[in-house]
Design a protein with these regions (language model features):
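Intrinsic-disorder-associated, low-complexity terminal segments enriched in Asp/Asn/His/Tyr and depleted
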Residues: 12, 17, 30-34, 50
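Cationic, amphipathic, low-complexity segments that mediate targeting or membrane/lipid association
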Residues: 21-25
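Short, positively charged and aromatic/hydrophobic N-terminal segments
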Residues: 26-34, 40-41
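C-terminal nucleotide
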Residues: 49-74, 99-133, 229-376, 391-432
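Gly/Ser-rich oxyanion-binding loop with an adjacent helix/lid
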Residues: 53-68, 75-79, 84, 88, ...
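Short Gly/aromatic-enriched secondary-structure transition segments
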Residues: 86-93, 271-272
Length: 432
């Protein structure tokens, strides 16, 4: 047998074996219809991933990882651009996560390595106020700095960051990194902590150390998430309620439009000014502390005080707050069709009244809504790029992604990224 024929035969055998393995997986997944079997698959995938990452850790730090600390990225089911208006939000933690493989070393050095990034970032625990300019590692340094200011002893450790939350997607990769770091450092310091405190420390690190203006929702969901539940959260008081997010034969598909984020913060600040202007006008006739306290009926009676974009912005906030409560009731009643309708309404409002979508998010959402397998779709996050979420029938996800992805590419000129998600716990700690 000639060498070229041998190579072709080996390649053919490899391809056929790979097809057989893929077929076995597809068959197994098709018959895997209950939660117990799904949990077995998830456990096996996690164990395999941990084994690979432990090998990576050892190749970098020449020692074995002891623990993996994780925190979730997040979606906000509904309730966009209302948190700074006193409204309630409805986030949930995802299976897209920041996983920190760690080993306590003692001393005063924290060494960090990152998936997809060459080299090691090293910070000293007695110089934590000097790393604000770091391009990589400043979130971690900020968390360590504020924990130390609270009296937590920050001990030396080696950390490998494996983050599956897409960066720049609006799924809060920064919050997941911060919260996972916070639980890591608290565990290694041997101190008791509660998850709300982890969220608050993480938010403070992002605001005051990294210099990024954000509310508490992202870190709260990342820390406090609960499997198969969303969190109805009042960002002003931190009062919260877990609401079962049972989608049955449906799942949430996240689509990233992959548009570069430009000038998001400046547009965000303009929107805040506009709703504050609306509130001041409404307060001349109604004794309310925030726009979220205004009911749709009251708004109809006082909207004459507003005009132009200020009126549109206020209308979105008032109606979106009402939609949050309606969505909670729909979930409690098991009415997924109504939930989907509310997601669609939310997107229309963000597009027409708050004007934070853009052609990319509008295209993704519109193409999703054309699919019979989709109950509803809307943008999530600050807007002007980022992601949509869609409620899609599980058995139709592959076709949904293929058709929506093609339509989006044909319309926009570049590809979207899709993620079939599950709702998971926020913070987890696992000994390896």
């Amino acid at each position: 047998m000639r060498e070229s024929q041998g190579k072709e035969l080996c390649a053919d055998i490899f391809i056929r074996n790979r097809r057989k393995r893929r077929l076995r997986v597809e068959i197994f997944e098709n018959i895997c219809y209950n939660k117990e079997e799904q949990s077995i698959i998830f456990w096996r995938q996690k164990r395999r991933r941990n084994k690979i990452k432990m090998q990576v850790f050892e190749s970098i730090f020449l020692d074995k990882a002891e623990y993996v600390f994780t925190a979730g990225g997040r979606i906000n089911v509904i309730g966009e651009h209302v948190d700074y208006c006193g409204g309630k939000v409805f986030p949930a933690a995802l299976n897209l996560r920041c996983n920190v493989y760690g080993r306590k070393t003692g001393g005063n050095s924290i060494r960090m390595a990152f998936r997809g990034i060459d080299g090691i970032v090293e910070i000293e625990t007695d110089k934590l106020d000097s790393y604000k300019g770091l391009k990589i590692g400043n979130y971690q340094a900020g968390v360590a700095y504020f924990l130390q200011k609270e009296g937590v002893e920050i001990v030396g450790c080696d950390l490998y960051y494996d983050c599956t939350v897409p960066f720049g997607s609006g799924l809060s990769s920064s919050a997941a990194i911060e919260v996972a770091t916070a639980v890591t450092l608290c565990e290694y310091a041997g101190v008791e902590y509660d998850k709300v405190h982890l969220a608050l420390v993480s938010q403070r690190a992002e605001n005051e150390y990294a210099g990024v203006n954000c509310g508490i929702m992202d870190q709260f969901a990342s820390a406090m998430g609960k499997k198969d539940h969303a969190v109805l959260l009042d960002c002003s008081t931190l009062e919260y309620e877990y609401v079962p997010l049972q989608l049955g034969e449906y799942c949430l598909v996240v689509a990233n439009c992959n548009k570069p984020h430009n000038l998001v913060e400046s547009k965000y600040n303009v929107r805040r000014q506009e709703v504050e202007t609306a509130l001041k006008a409404i307060q001349t006739v109604l004794p309310v502390k925030c726009l979220a306290e205004v009911t749709p009926k009251q708004f109809a009676e006082v909207r004459y005080l507003l005009s132009g974009v200020v009126e549109k912005r206020a209308e979105h906030v008032v109606m979106e707050c009402a939609r949050v409560h309606s969505a909670v009731e729909a979930l409690k009643a098991g009415d997924l069709v109504e939930l989907g309708r509310l997601l669609n309404e939310s997107h229309y409002s963000l597009r027409d009244l708050y004007e934070v979508t853009g052609k990319e998010l509008d295209a993704l959402s519109a193409f999703a809504r054309k699919e019979n397998a989709c109950l509803g779709s809307r943008m999530i996050g600050a807007g002007f790029g980022g992601c949509t979420i869609s409620i899609v029938k599980k058995t139709e996800v592959e076709g949904f992604v293929r058709r929506v992805g093609k339509a989006y590419f044909d319309a926009i000129g570049y590809k979207a990224s899709f993620y079939e998600t599950s709702i998971e716990d926020g913070v987890t700690v696992e000994k390896l």
